[in-house]
């Protein structure tokens, strides 16, 4: 299991701690922490701890605000983790991927030395001619080295580097005017022009309410899923929203929102959840009439993952058995 944490604040306000850092999450926040994070006991919000063997997210802690429109999509991702899936969905991992590429460093030693100065301090105002004199080459030679090895002229490369850094700062709540000054643009209008040229968007697209390196937009649709799994101990399956079908040798049941069915320990089961639907495994003994997402989170925080995904050979055998064993469908 990855030691990193991915936390979705479904509702309310919560305090999250990891290492020496403290984050306050509000409804609609998604937090990635490179180490295990803990939700404070006195938090008033509902936080879903989305745990996978592999998150495919790298780098420092980041909090991004998606808004309540992403609630169902992230709740579905939480359900995937409880069903034993090993990897975070690519469309969620991509939310943390930089959408403004860092310009490539030039290969020639003189040009690379200049580029490294600008990486360390994007606001540096040294001109091409001054850099050339420092490096002991002509301005024309330095310009040619940048253009040939990166595809950018010197001024274009500097602007691209500034835009890359600016996008990161904007995603961390710095104002556009402050960011323009920090990365070396004389005015916000200069930053805006550079953004349009290098990203096709304005700086406001990268501010709070959007995602780090670009707008998150509307959440992707919840896909239909099929899971072949085995319960470690007696489990129940609760349909949070939509519909699902549970099939075992000799048994098949179609279920709707709010329904619950028991999966006996050791039973190999096929679970088909319809598109736009969400289902959760929960311990035996819970009453379907009192079930809600808060209870799902509480009980699953106290137990290991309840289901194990079958190996391909196992689910292939189960599929053949289900196909050749006609059973009545229960509604």
UniProtKB/Swiss-Prot annotation:
DNA-binding region: 129-150, 176-199
GO MF annotation list: DNA-binding transcription factor activity; sequence-specific DNA binding
Gene Ontology process terms (BP): regulation of DNA-templated transcription
Expression triggers: Repressed by DtxR under iron excess.
Record keywords, A-Z: DNA-binding, Repressor, Transcription, Transcription regulation
Stored SMART domains: HTH_ARAC (SM00342)
Residue ranges occupied by any HTH araC/xylS-type domain in the UniProt entry: 112-209
Domain of life of the source: Bacteria
Classification via SUPFAM superfamilies: Homeodomain-like (SSF46689), RmlC-like cupins (SSF51182)
Knockout consequences: Under iron limitation, the ripA deletion mutant shows a 2-fold higher aconitase activity and a higher mRNA level for the acn, catA, leuCD, narKGHJI, sdhCAB and pta genes.
Role of this protein: Under iron limitation, RipA negatively controls the expression of the acn (aconitase), catA (catechol 1,2 dioxygenase), leuCD (isopropylmalate dehydratase), narKGHJI (nitrite/nitrate transporter and nitrate reductase), sdhCAB (succinate dehydrogenase), pta (phosphotransacetylase) and katA (catalase) genes. Binds to the consensus sequence in the promoter region.
PANTHER family: HTH-TYPE TRANSCRIPTIONAL REGULATOR NIMR, TRANSCRIPTIONAL REGULATOR-RELATED
The protein, known as: HTH-type transcriptional regulator RipA
Originating organism: Corynebacterium glutamicum (strain ATCC 13032 / DSM 20300 / JCM 1318 / BCRC 11384 / CCUG 27702 / LMG 3730 / NBRC 12168 / NCIMB 10025 / NRRL B-2784 / 534)
């Amino acid at each position: 299991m990855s030691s990193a944490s991915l936390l979705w604040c479904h509702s309310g306000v919560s305090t999250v701690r990891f290492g020496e850092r403290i984050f306050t999450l509000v409804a609609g926040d998604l937090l990635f922490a490179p180490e295990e994070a803990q939700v404070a006991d006195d938090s008033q919000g509902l936080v879903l701890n989305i745990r996978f063997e592999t998150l495919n997210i790298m780098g420092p802690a980041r909090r991004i605000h998606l808004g309540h429109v992403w609630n169902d999509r992230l709740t579905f991702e939480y359900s995937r983790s409880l069903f034993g899936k090993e990897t975070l969905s690519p469309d969620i991992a991509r939310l943390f991927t930089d959408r403004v590429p860092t310009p490539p460093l030039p290969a020639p030693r003189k040009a690379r030395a200049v580029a490294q100065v600008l990486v360390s301090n994007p606001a540096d105002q040294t001109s091409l001619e001054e850099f050339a004199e420092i490096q002991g080459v002509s301005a024309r030679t330095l310009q040619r080295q940048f253009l040939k090895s990166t595809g950018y002229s010197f001024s274009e490369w500097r602007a691209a580097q500034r835009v890359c850094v600016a996008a990161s700062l904007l995603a961390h709540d710095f104002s556009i005017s402050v960011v323009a000054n920090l990365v070396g643009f004389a005015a916000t209008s200069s930053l805006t022009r550079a953004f349009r040229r290098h990203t096709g968007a304005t700086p406001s697209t990268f501010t709070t309410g959007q995602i780090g390196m670009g707008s998150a937009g509307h959440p992707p649709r919840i896909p239909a899923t099929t899971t072949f799994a085995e319960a470690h101990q007696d489990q129940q399956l609760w349909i949070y929203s939509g519909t699902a079908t549970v099939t075992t040798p000799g048994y098949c049941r179609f279920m709707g929102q709010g329904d619950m069915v028991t999966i006996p320990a050791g039973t190999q089961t096929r679970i088909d959840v319809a598109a736009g639907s969400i289902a959760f495994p929960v311990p035996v003994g819970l009453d379907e009439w009192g079930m809600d997402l808060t209870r799902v989170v509480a009980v699953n925080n106290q137990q290991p993952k309840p289901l194990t995904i079958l190996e391909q050979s196992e689910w292939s055998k189960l599929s053949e058995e289900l196909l050749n064993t006609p059973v009545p469908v229960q509604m």
